[in-house]
Amino acid sequence: MATGGKVSFKVTLTSDPKLPFKVFSVPEGAPFTAVLKFAAEEFKVPPQTSAIITNDGIGINPQQSAGNVFLKHGSELRLIPRDRVGAVFVMDP
């Protein structure tokens, strides 16, 4: 990858029924943890307990560069706040 290039992500907030989205352009060498934190803060949800997944529901490891995420998963991603991450439903028999 060339240094100095940028990648763009369209991030949709899944917890809002209106499915608002924002488009971010970041340096391709930026850590994806920073992208996750920035996106969460833009949507006013806690970044420490949020996750980003693909439109197909595949979780993304944030310990890689934004450029790697773009190449592996494309530009359309979904932000899941804590109330949606790892939810467990228990039904009484």
From Swiss-Prot:
<protein>
    <recommendedName>
        <fullName>Ubiquitin-fold modifier 1</fullName>
    </recommendedName>
</protein>
<keyword id="KW-0833">Ubl conjugation pathway</keyword>
<dbReference type="InterPro" id="IPR005375">
    <property type="entry name" value="UFM1"/>
</dbReference>
<feature type="propeptide" description="Removed in mature form">
    <location>
        <begin position="87"/>
        <end position="93"/>
    </location>
</feature>
<dbReference type="GO" id="GO:0071569">
    <property type="term" value="P:protein ufmylation"/>
</dbReference>
<dbReference type="Pfam" id="PF03671">
    <property type="entry name" value="Ufm1"/>
</dbReference>
<keyword id="KW-1017">Isopeptide bond</keyword>
<comment type="similarity">
    <text>Belongs to the UFM1 family.</text>
</comment>
<dbReference type="InterPro" id="IPR029071">
    <property type="entry name" value="Ubiquitin-like_domsf"/>
</dbReference>
<dbReference type="GO" id="GO:0005829">
    <property type="term" value="C:cytosol"/>
</dbReference>
<comment type="function">
    <text>Ubiquitin-like modifier protein which binds to a number of as yet unidentified target proteins.</text>
</comment>
<feature type="cross-link" description="Glycyl lysine isopeptide (Gly-Lys) (interchain with K-? in acceptor proteins)">
    <location>
        <position position="86"/>
    </location>
</feature>
